[in-house]
Structure formats: C-alpha cells, structure tokens
Amino acid sequence: MSCHNCARRTLGLFIRSFANVEPTFAPKRTLIRNAQPSRLLHASTARAPYKSDQRDRAAPPTQKEADIEAIAENAENAEDDALPAKYERPAWQAHKAALKEKLNGEAWNPRKKLSPDTMEGIRHLHSTQPDKFTTPVLAQHFKVSPEAIRRILKSKWQPSDEEYEARMERWNKRGERIWTNLVEMGVKPPKKWREMGVGRARGGERPKWKSDRRNLVHVRDSASDSFVMDDGDIIPIVDGTGKARRAPDIPLTRRL
C-alpha cells in the first residue's frame, strides 16, 4: 500500500510541475506616483494638521476676550498720552515743518531784501539791546516779515574780503536797476545814486524826476503806518518873534 501511495504522490508532483509553471525571474513592476496624497487614509495614518490651519479654523473670540483686548488697547493709548514733554517735538522742528509747508518746498526767497550793511546793523542792535530790539520790533521798523529778521539774527556767516566786494557790487547793480525804473516813473533818486549817474539826463534834456510826474508814485519808507504829521508842522511859518505858529484854518467856502 505504501508503494501505491508513493507512486500516486510521485505522479501528482509530476502533473503539478506542468500545470503551475512559475517564471524563473519575477516581472518588473511599474511604480505609479500620485501628485497628491490620497485622502482616503485611515485615521491612524492621517497626518496631523499644521498650527496655521488650527489658527485659521479657531473659533471667533468671545465677548469677554474682546473686552479684555479693548481694555489693553485703551491702557496703551493712555500711556502714550501720559508721556513727558521731553518726548514731544521741539518748537524749532514744528516751526521748520510749518514754514516748509507754507513755502511748498521752495527755497527762501523774500521779495524785499535788505542791504548787507542793514543786516549788520540789525545784528548789532539785537546783540547790544536784545530786550528792546526784539524780532517783532525790528520787523515792524524795517518793513519785513519776522521770519526774515529771525533768519538774519540766526546767520553767523562772515564773508571774506573778496566775497564782501563781490556782494557789494551785486547790491549796487541791484539798487541801480531799481532806481532806474523808479526814475522812469518820476521818483527822484537819492544823492548816492544820482552821483552814480542814475536819472541823469542826456543831450541837455530835463531829468524825468524833475518833470510834472515827479513824486506821483508812492514810496514807502521805514516810518510806521500810524506816524501822522500835520501839513502845518512840515513847513512851519515863522512870525516876527521867531516862534513858529500854525497856519490859520480857513474854511473852504472862504478860500473859494
């Protein structure tokens, strides 16, 4: 019986070798990589979300938390308002910013300019008696803005001899040009400019400042607007005693 079983077993192994033929080399497998990870993952293998995702998905703050944030913000604003005065912007910086805004970023170029000698006199007056010759007083007397006086007093620049001569030459040319235009309008130039030839007539003609149009143009001087003098005080009338007396007031009806 054992021999029969052995023969049967041998025959079965022989038939199985022809039915189930396995290749000697295993076939090459193709690897497919997905661009995105599969969302159908098990709960145990799924990755944990990032902290940013957790913050984005966080619940909105409650009313209590909003009140706490508002109280903290009000406390910070109160601390900013309670800062000492030394942290505030200095006055000169505020003045500079306001002046820059007023000039629209342009350079300082006033229409009325004072001569170099006048500016030196302003500095001398302010240095000797600063309580008397203040910036408003000097600005009112010389008919310029307080900002111009402030800049003159602030300037410490001292020209050299060559720079001073060139500066005075430019100033004389400027004065000659201005007074030449005023002579054309009938204004008598000062003696300094007449000696320099301003308003001098040529060919035996009469100077224009001696014509009928003389002094028809109003020229402002250094006197204040409140300075008023009566006509009788300008040219006093002297009687036999040598004392000045006022001209009699004659009504207009009698003078006609």
From Swiss-Prot:
Residues 1-48 form a transit peptide. The keyword Transit peptide applies. It is found in: Mitochondrion. The keyword Secreted does not apply. GO terms for cellular component: mitochondrion; nucleus. It comes from the Eukaryota. Residues 38-65 are annotated as: Disordered. Keywords: Mitochondrion, Transit peptide. PANTHER family: NEUGRIN. Belongs to the RRG9 family. Required for respiratory activity and maintenance and expression of the mitochondrial genome. This is Required for respiratory growth protein 9, mitochondrial. It comes from Phaeosphaeria nodorum (strain SN15 / ATCC MYA-4574 / FGSC 10173) (Glume blotch fungus).
